[in-house]
Amino acid sequence: MADPAECSIKVMCRFRPLNEAEILRGDKFIPKFKGEETVVIGQGKPYVFDRVLPPNTTQEQVYNACAKQIVKDVLEGYNGTIFAYGQTSSGKTHTMEGKLHDPQLMGIIPRIAHDIFDHIYSMDENLEFHIKVSYFEIYLDKIRDLLDVSKTNLAVHEDKNRVPYVKGCTERFVSSPEEVMDVIDEGKANRHVAVTNMNEHSSRSHSIFLINIKQENVETEKKLSGKLYLVDLAGSEKVSKTGAEGAVLDEAKNINKSLSALGNVISALAEGTKTHVPYRDSKMTRILQDSLGGNCRTTIVICCSPSVFNEAETKSTLMFGQRAKTIKNTVSVNLELTAEEWKKKYEKEKEKNKALKSVIQHLEVELNRWRNGEAVPEDEQISAKDQKNLEPCDNTPIIDNITPVVDGISAEKEKYDEEITSLYRQLDDKDDEINQQSQLAEKLKQQMLDQDELLASTRRDYEKIQEELTRLQIENEAAKDEVKEVLQALEELAVNYDQKSQEVEDKTRANEQLTDELAQKTTTLTTTQRELSQLQELSNHQKKRATEILNLLLKDLGEIGGIIGTNDVKTLADVNGVIEEEFTMARLYISKMKSEVKSLVNRSKQLESAQTDSNRKMNASERELAACQLLISQHEAKIKSLTDYMQNMEQKRRQLEESQDSLSEELAKLRAQEKMHEVSFQDKEKEHLTRLQDAEEVKKALEQQMESHREAHQKQLSRLRDEIEEKQRIIDEIRDLNQKLQLEQERLSSDYNKLKIEDQEREVKLEKLLLLNDKREQAREDLKGLEETVSRELQTLHNLRKLFVQDLTTRVKKSVELDSDDGGGSAAQKQKISFLENNLEQLTKVHKQLVRDNADLRCELPKLEKRLRATAERVKALESALKEAKENAMRDRKRYQQEVDRIKEAVRAKNMARRAHSAQIAKPIRPGHYPASSPTAVHAVRGGGGSSNSTHYQK
């Protein structure tokens, strides 16, 4: 290391512009700038700094004033530090980072990343550089690696030169500005930020970006190294202004605590009278120990708010900057000497040691003469000038009484240093142990988060299943109502059918009675026909004329009135008209009977088709019920698997509790060992009470720190226990819900059995309806035979009518000659006619009754058809709903499978990322040569670029 030189900490003061909230609030702009180094707040005293940057200063101007020179110093072998200090929302992160990829608004860190490589490319080609970067944050007084989030509580150790460093922090080798920016982007994405009343993106941690540059001259083998700390501090907060609460309030407490420790270190260094500087009060001051009063060129950028609302905080920040400006650092070049240089330095120190020994010998001689009472003349006394000119003497060394005392003090000092070193070593071991425990706790926490995610997904699946079950229950109830309506309609139809069948049987019996009566009448008519045949034999000469009259009567019955001319004939004609009307009514009755029989046949066909559709729909309903039962069994299997999974989780929880108990036992053992060390240390303290006061203070600080770590560990364990109890409560709730689902499933099974029984009853009723349908077919055949019989009888009646008309015509013409015979014949004919009229009247009444019944049936038929159509539509709707439910179930099953695959992939990727910490390849950089385009290897090119060799370094 080169000879040290003193330098002061540079302090730059930057004021940001008023933000929108301050402008809307009407805050006053209070700073007044006097030159480039002085600022006055209100009517107060002036504050002088190395540079004052007003609000209109650009990011490039800030960089040129604050950081450009430090980059050159680091490349020359010095250590450098730049950190921003100020209250929250004062612009620290904007100053240090800005917008990372905006050429105009990027801050100090991205500009340094580009400027370092620009300087390297312009330097001597014989220089070879190795650059590695680290990025970590101090969150809740714990060091957290931003490039590997699994490292959450790293320890601070000291190297052989007593320089603090973060042990276990991830280091990335870089060879271009783009790689540095990638590292910054990766780390910034993992940094803690939050929203407060004063800042939408408030940093909740102190971030430190470390650039370690090693350079070697390949010709002279001269090696230089430099470190550059780029620190973005979290701002001090006043809770009444930020409105912090909950976790944000805890973060604010830790931020203010660490900033208070930084202020104490600055104050101790500024006063210069204190023998102890409290670097170990916080991890941030411990890391920045070299930057504050050590071997480092340090620049502090104090960021201030110009608003009168923050006047008190601004003045406090300015006072901090003035105190820091008085601190002196001792800087030297970090030079690694070669073997030849070490040899020269050794010879030089050896000669210097010889000269000092000779001076000591002369001084001891002079001291002995004084002690023996001899007065040493002034010319024989050794002055400061003579000490430099004295040569080493070869006389026999004089035994001095002071030498043993000096040796004893040196031995005690060495012993004291060894004890302090052992205490520091123990502290480092404790830090390592705490780091391991923290990583274990973080892994457990990550496992808990994974389990929470799985539990949440399980809960979502359960809710979906519950919704599906509810929907199926609603559809089941609706289907029950539909089935009840259909059954009711079928029952009504069956009752109506029974009534109509009974009526048809009654009408059939009436028709049989009428048939018997007609048979009797036929016999009577036969006798009458024989009599008429006898009369016909008597009137053959009138046969031709009677035939013509009969043809005329068949064409038009109205012509009978034109043939008959007398009053008697007119009366007979009226009687004949009545008979003709009754025959016509009989024909109409028969035709209506035909139409009714046809309508009954059509209706029977419709009922058969409706019955077929009902059977088909019932089969579809059975298939739907079977599918629903299959879905319920699948859900039962899924619930059973979830229950097994919850039992596995319970076993894991017990294992975690056992591991926790074992850790508690180990902690108790460590405490016992600590007490034993305390007892031994107290024994030593009695012997060296006056000399070990500083060691006692260090021990107290160590105990306090261990107590704080112990309390934090206990809190974390209690929090994990609470989380485990909460998970157990959730598992109990899921178990209860599972039991409810089982009860619901049993209820659905009972409903299904009831539906099955009802379905069987409906099948029995359908069989009865089929039997009734067969009876109806038989009745239809009987009606058909009856129709043929009636038609034959009507034909017979028609023939009788013809004969009767002929007889009447004959009797009208022979009325004068056969008066007495006609009187008797007329009485007999009148009796026959009245008998026929009575029969026709009865037939007419029967016909009218059948017409009314037919009309009633036709009125009832549209209602039944409408109800049947509604039932068919509902069955179609149920079929479509069932189809849609099946499709939704398939989609949900696919979505669930995709979600499970995604979670598995995420866990697998996370595990791969945790295992992916393999060795890295260092990337040497040569000035004058830009980085190669290949991402796999970087070529170190010698001067002139004629040859290249791929150089790799293992981390």
Swiss-Prot record:
It holds the Pfam family Kinesin. Keywords: ATP-binding, Cell projection, Coiled coil, Cytoplasm, Cytoskeleton, Hydrolase, Microtubule, Motor protein, Nucleotide-binding, Phosphoprotein, Transport. ATP binds at Q87, S89, S90, G91, K92, T93, H94, K99. InterPro entries: Kinesin-like_fam, Kinesin_motor_CS, Kinesin_motor_dom, Kinesin_motor_dom_sf, P-loop_NTPase. Residues 859-955 are annotated as: Globular. It is found in: Cytoplasm, Cytoskeleton; Cell projection, Dendrite. Gene3D superfamilies: 6.10.250.1590, Kinesin motor domain. GO terms for cellular component: axon cytoplasm; axonal growth cone; ciliary rootlet; cytoplasm; dendrite; dendrite cytoplasm; distal axon; GABA-ergic synapse. Residues 909-955 are annotated as: Disordered. Residues 8-327 form the Kinesin motor domain. The modification Phosphothreonine is found at T403. Its EC number is 3.6.4.-. Residues 332-366, 413-538, 590-913 form a coiled coil. Residues 174-315 are annotated as: Microtubule-binding. The keyword Zinc does not apply. It catalyses: ATP + H2O = ADP + phosphate + H(+). GO terms for molecular function: apolipoprotein receptor binding; ATP binding; ATP hydrolysis activity; microtubule binding; microtubule motor activity. The keyword Hydrolase applies. GO terms for biological process: anterograde axonal protein transport; anterograde dendritic transport of messenger ribonucleoprotein complex; intracellular mRNA localization; motor neuron axon guidance; mRNA transport. Belongs to the TRAFAC class myosin-kinesin ATPase superfamily. Kinesin family. Kinesin subfamily. Microtubule-associated force-producing protein that may play a role in organelle transport. Has ATPase activity. Involved in synaptic transmission. Mediates dendritic trafficking of mRNAs. Required for anterograde axonal transportation of MAPK8IP3/JIP3 which is essential for MAPK8IP3/JIP3 function in axon elongation. Oligomer composed of two heavy chains and two light chains. Interacts with GRIP1. Interacts with TRAK1. Interacts with ZFYVE27. Interacts with KLC3. Composed of three structural domains: a large globular N-terminal domain which is responsible for the motor activity of kinesin (it hydrolyzes ATP and binds microtubule), a central alpha-helical coiled coil domain that mediates the heavy chain dimerization; and a small globular C-terminal domain which interacts with other proteins (such as the kinesin light chains), vesicles and membranous organelles. This is Kinesin heavy chain isoform 5C. The lineage of its organism: Eukaryota, Metazoa, Chordata, Craniata, Vertebrata.
